[in-house]
């Protein structure tokens, strides 16, 4: 997409073409913002996004993070239906306990999950073995399972969100290094690039 000419003005400039930057650009487009450019110094996903495992566990100790991860699962399901799927695999997740104290904590998490409408269920060792046959259960006392957790390919997710952002009017420029973020009166006024 860098073959197009870099505009001299834009209302919003997103710096970075990893999963974070493309997500911001995608959501800005979803909110109706049309004067948006994204600048990436190399290729999309060429930074830390490439190294991520892409595991998506929804339940967190922080309610905001739990809601954000639940939203992410819904977004990934929607992206799977788009022209550029994100390679979302809703394979579920297992947490195991190797002590009675840890099992008590898992039971508390099951209650916490219910407050968000997440169907986190307690499972026996036999059920753990059925879900993950390679596990050694010698020190396992039990666990829990959340069927709607999963894994997404971070590179595919980035490409899917970039495609959605482009469809919404965002212009993406790769091989464009940001050299400076310029300010005046404590406000960002412009960015300087190598182009």
Which positions does each model-derived feature cover?
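Short loop/edge segments at beta-strand edges and connector loops
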Residues: 40, 124-125, 174-176
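Gly/Ala-rich phosphate-binding loop of Rossmann-like dinucleotide-binding domains
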Residues: 25, 29, 164-166
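Short, flexible hinge/linker loops that cap or flank conserved catalytic cores
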Residues: 4-7, 30, 88
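Dinucleotide-binding Rossmann-like beta1-alpha1 core, especially the glycine-rich loop
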Residues: 53-131
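Helical element adjacent to the flavin cofactor pocket in flavoenzyme catalytic cores
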Residues: 144-195
């Amino acid at each position: 997409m860098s073959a197009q000419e870099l505009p001299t003005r834009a209302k919003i400039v997103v710096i970075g073409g990893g999963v974070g930057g493309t997500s911001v650009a995608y959501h800005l487009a979803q909110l109706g913002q049309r004067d948006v450019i994204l600048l990436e110094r190399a290729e999309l996903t060429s930074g830390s996004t490439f190294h991520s495992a892409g595991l998506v566990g929804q339940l967190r100790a922080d309610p905001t993070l739990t809601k954000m991860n639940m939203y992410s699962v819904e977004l990934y399901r929607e992206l799977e239906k788009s022209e550029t799927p994100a390679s979302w695999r809703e394979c579920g997740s297992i947490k195991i306990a190797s002590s009675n104290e840890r099992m008590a904590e898992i039971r508390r998490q099951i209650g916490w999950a219910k407050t968000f409408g997440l169907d986190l269920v307690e499972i026996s060792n036999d059920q753990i073995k059925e879900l993950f046959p390679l596990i050694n259960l010698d020190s396992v006392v039990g666990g829990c399972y959340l069927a709607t957790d999963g894994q997404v390919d971070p590179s595919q997710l980035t490409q899917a969100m970039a495609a959605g952002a482009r469809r919404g009017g965002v212009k993406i420029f790769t091989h464009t290094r940001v050299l400076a973020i310029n300010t005046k009166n404590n406000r960002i006024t412009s960015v300087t690039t190598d182009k």
